[in-house]
């Protein structure tokens, strides 16, 4: 039997809310790595990683027909995107 609109909305809320909360929690954990007393990082490489994350958010929003734009220093994140940024960050 096909689901009603109300059932689909309830299922979306049940599935999406914990996933969104989990994603937000992961961003907080990434932020915990900003303590310079405990960690050292390359600012240029880190910027590439954040662009990678922003593009993932843009792509996710696009799946919901939501147009999201981010800029970093006047440059659109899509123009800064490098697919291998995370692998390069680790090297």
Please name every model-derived segment.
Residues 2-91:
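N-terminal intrinsically disordered, cationic/polar leader segments
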